[in-house]
Amino acid sequence: MRLFVLLAYIIPFILCQLTPVLVASHKLVRGLKEEINPSNTLPHNVTSVTNMLKKLITECSSDAYLLINQPGLTYADLTTEKKDNWPFLRNYLYMSSTIVGLPRVENPIDLDFLEQYIISNCDAETINVWHDSEDEVVDYYDIRKRVIRIDLSPLSISNHDDRVKEIFEHDQLIRKILRKLPSAHYTIILTSLEPGIIHPVPRFLMEETPASFEIFDDIINDPFHNREIEKNDRFHKVEPNWNPIRDSNDRYYRNKKKDEIHLFDYELWEKNEKLITTIFVMVLSLFMMKIISFFNYLKQKIIQKKQQKSKRGIIADDKKLD
């Protein structure tokens, strides 16, 4: 009986499932690390990590958000030792203004919640990738933000060579998908809803050899690469050059509104100053002619009445004489 009790306490420390979370954004979002524990030696609380991601999303600084679920992924697949398996992802980390790597999170991140949070806060729509194919992301040219949900196939557990090959292929798939996007402003959130099994490691060992237990320690924990500076805005702020909306109801109503003529529009009056002046003079002339004509009419009526009165007076005098 004591043996079973002992095993019940020991087994959770022998094998455990902790989710890695890697965040990279083209644009700078300040203060993300204030939401989480600064040390990665202990597992992070999923609530604090979710709050950090909400802070990242709330600014809506990206035009596309890639929510990537890699079943079977562990932090061991993302260490500096495995950098050759992720050539594109690492290259993107070098270019990103915001990078956060959390090797161990207590529970999986709720990607469905994040998807809905992006949709409601950034007026986005979702594109799903379920079959490891970039063709599932159709070309688009409008300015609406996108949530790209990528559910990758599980990584091999038994065969190390197959696992390495699968990771490399998935890295290339991410590259191909990003190349299809019309904007370079995007955010990657890589995690696992079904993480692989890892062995617990003593805290002192993590502190002594962080490169073996951190996500790409040579980039993320390098002060030169992970400073809170905008790497992609060194010269001046330039908004992405979006293609115009094609065959869109929004565009129709916007153009219709532009075509509306408002009487009290200052620009309209300024643009048509000569025409308006001419019309005003013509209307004023017609008005003056009408007034003059009216006064002439009144004058004639008055003269006629006076003549009629004078005639009546003459007739009355003649009758008296008779």
From Swiss-Prot:
This protein's encoding gene: BIG1
Lumenal topology ranges: 17-274
Described purpose of this protein according to its UniProt entry: Required for normal beta-1,6-glucan synthesis, for hyphal morphogenesis, adhesion and virulence.
Organism: Candida albicans (strain SC5314 / ATCC MYA-2876)
Cytoplasmic side: 296-322
Protein name: Protein BIG1
Post-translational modification: N-glycosylated.
InterPro entries: Big1
Entry-listed glycosylation sites: N45
Membrane-topology annotation of the record: Single-pass type I membrane protein
GO biological process terms, semicolon-separated: (1->6)-beta-D-glucan biosynthetic process; adhesion of symbiont to host; cell wall organization; cellular response to starvation; filamentous growth; filamentous growth of a population of unicellular organisms in response to starvation; fungal-type cell wall biogenesis
Misc. comment: Present with 3460 molecules/cell in log phase SD medium.
Family: Belongs to the BIG1 family.
The keyword ATP-binding is assigned to this record: no
Any single GO CC term annotated in Swiss-Prot or TrEMBL for this entry: membrane
Compartments it resides in: Endoplasmic reticulum membrane
Chief subcellular location: endoplasmic reticulum
Record's keyword terms, sorted: Cell wall biogenesis/degradation, Endoplasmic reticulum, Glycoprotein, Membrane, Signal, Transmembrane, Transmembrane helix
Signal peptide boundaries: 1-16
Transmembrane segments: 275-295
